[in-house]
């Protein structure tokens, strides 16, 4: 007998709950109820500059007003940064990441200068400027005090993955994994020791989430999350994704 499905609603307390948040919460709660599953509430508060305690208090009050219930305790990402650090360390050890010293201005300039910059669903992709730096070059720039982010080397991730990996989306059916769809995404920054892509993947795995509901705007992010999950968190399999329109 299979265990009950586990779903999560994971808002960021960067402002008051808006209608889209409320709809997403109600949708996820309804799916969990219909499937006889569990609903988790996770506070995604890794952006310490924008997230505020008063917004979290208001968010919880609004969810209570909507009549929603969830499993306890509530997981707050800011309290579990070590989990993300451990996941990132493992990816680093497996040579699936690299430091990127480019500023946003430099990236935009390189994209503008390229004859045919690679594009993904959300626009131009990072051109890979720092991907092929030597170890000595990277070490020298670090020792020189240059700020850097950590990016996923999606080409290496693709080679690590078995061909034909997929997941099921309830709206669009079987989805074949494309590890390079979003390019070399940022997994951690100097000011925030993780990123949305890394934190959400790690937390879903640790919390045993089996079904994910998300908006159309995040549909293609599933490729990034499955890439990180399959290469690092191989034991965790999310059954399916449901798009909340």
What is each stretch, according to the model?
Residues 1-119, 205, 216-217, 221-234:
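N-terminal Rossmann-like or analogous alpha/beta NTP/dinucleotide-binding catalytic cores
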